[in-house]
Amino acid sequence: MRTLWIVAVWLVGVEGNLYQFGKMIKNKTGKPAMFSYSAYGCYCGWGGQGKPQDPSDRCCFLHDCCYTRVNNCSPKMTLYSYRFENGDIICGDNDPCRKAVCECDREAAICLGENVNTYDEKYRFYSSSYCTEEESEKC
């Protein structure tokens, strides 16, 4: 059920921030975000609970924390401007909310790229029923 919800959100949100975030992830990891990270581990995808399963999942945990800090900006749907330049992601918005959301996505994409070697297929489409351990850290 979680996977269907995530796919539905991705399809509805292709014009919004989730599409932009997906492009950043693809740029940094070489992996298509929707198929590789939309239901990965305990934190990649919609929602999250428990303990991150590996460094890639921890990137998503940190991304969730960042979104919590900018929650008043509607981070999952806020459009922002950015560009790829010499392998870097440059957030280019003067609006504080848009800039903050872009920076959350940028940092997560960089983190996923730096940890792409930890990606483990066993955590792809991981059931949230396995995410019952207490969080290892707080935001």
From Swiss-Prot:
Disulfide bonds join 42-131, 44-60, 59-111, 65-139, 66-104, 73-97, 91-102. Its main location: secreted. One of its GO terms (molecular function) is calcium-dependent phospholipase A2 activity. Expressed by the venom gland. Binds 1 Ca(2+) ion. Coiled coil: none annotated. Keywords: Calcium, Disulfide bond, Hydrolase, Lipid degradation, Lipid metabolism, Metal-binding, Secreted, Signal. GO terms for cellular component: extracellular region. PROSITE patterns: PA2_ASP, PA2_HIS. It is found in: Secreted. Its cofactor is Ca(2+). It holds the Pfam family Phospholip_A2_1. Residues 1-16 form the signal peptide. The active site is at 63, 105. PLA2 catalyzes the calcium-dependent hydrolysis of the 2-acyl groups in 3-sn-phosphoglycerides. This is Acidic phospholipase A2 4. It comes from Echis carinatus sochureki.
